[in-house]
């Protein structure tokens, strides 16, 4: 049975990832401050991910218990801009990522998937995107401390994979994560389309995001790869043509947008 450490396994996306991985035969160990649901089937290790000593000890402890972990899924972070002061967002998120990835590499892990973010694309798009649908081809445009850290993580992954050609690091630029209970709010978005223009009306169901994590883990890719992860539609019932005409009339449109197709290109994924 393949063994994976999941950081942030008690969060919205993390819970779905743990469930998905356990269901598909992975042996899951969760590193987090908060325990995942007791019925998750995962082993829980309470930990402060900003403390490298704790992280390394836990990772090597997993190695001692299980021979070694086979993979790492890193989801733990301050989850969005504005939750805490900027300096805390920066210090927490960059140190957690470095600590977890560094400890995993020390334990011999070469299969790493981590949560990047759609915010790297220039959200909240106060400066309009260069074209729509947005994709992975244009350089990152971080507009917040949160997205700046995600940009640095992507750059770090590229260099770590250059150092070790056997290392795989896949960054998933998740859109706004939704759970089933969140769908009740979708009809209200039509009354105020401006409230969702910040991410081009995109979203990702936590269960679909979890599937993306599993498929990334199980892929035979090497090196670093970045993917936008969003659902195939928008949160709106208004057609894309109307939304673009109202909010982004001067932005280049590439291809057929469809009536409700996502404006966060998932073609690469």
Regions found by a protein language model. Name each.
Residues 207-269:
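C-terminal substrate-binding subdomain of Rossmann-fold SDR/epimerase-dehydratase oxidoreductases
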Residues 122, 145, 162-187:
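Flexible, glycine-rich beta-alpha linker
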Residues 91, 126-165:
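Catalytic helix-loop patch of NAD(P)-dependent Rossmann-fold dehydrogenases
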Residues 4-24:
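N-terminal Rossmann NAD(P)H-binding glycine-rich loop of SDR-like oxidoreductase domains
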Residues 65-67, 84-113:
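NAD(P)-cofactor binding segment of oxidoreductase domains
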Residues 99-143:
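Conserved Rossmann-fold NAD(P)-dependent oxidoreductase catalytic core, especially the SDR/UDP-sugar
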Residues 49-92:
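NAD(P)H-binding glycine-rich loop region in Rossmannoid oxidoreductase-like domains
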Residues 177-193, 199-226:
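Alpha-helical substrate-binding/gating segment
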